Amino acid sequence: MRYLTFALTKGRLARKTLALLEQLGITCEEMKDKDSRKLIFVNEELKLKFFLAKGPDVPTYVEYGAADIGVVGKDTIMEEGREVHEVLDLRFGNCRMCVCGPKSAQELLKHRELIRVATKYPRIAKDYFYNQKHQTVEIIKLNGSIELAPLVGLAEVIVDIVETGSTLKENKLEVLEEVCPLSARMIVNPVSMRLENERIKDLISKLRALIQEA
């Protein structure tokens, strides 16, 4: 039996995924050692391997077959646009992708004015404005604090992930439109899905049952 390899998004998503898998009896004791410098963790008994990666890299590892299965946020799947199968909504890491800005920007959106949009997610923003709203905009890619853009006049609105909305309120910004809901998803390499169909489908069905019970 070959190893099934998991690429998990570092941080909270990895911890939640491992807790979920543990409920199915799938554990990896090596990963619990906080002092470990290992990059790949192995469960020899179940023939499973795990490694941690930055969110945007997870779909890349899965598309190229370096990992059979990945767990990553829906926002990353949409933004990276990789050839992977999205097989399961894990229903944690819930948040929203939204268009945000000062209240005054609402009219600009309503009348589909030519505006500037600052975001870490240019692909998602472009798809939303061009394909769903049919509004021509100038998209500005930023990497840092996106909320700053409307405050200094760089852009009229931003497209960003909203969890609690507290940062928006502190800066007198608000959610103007919701692009889509987000959560952690399981993705699978298309070739792995064919080669290991039984094992992967069994895992998906067990996880789905567990999630529905919660």
Task: Please name every model-derived segment.
Residues M1-A214:
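Domain-level signature for soluble enzymes in the chorismate/prephenate branch of the shikimate pathway
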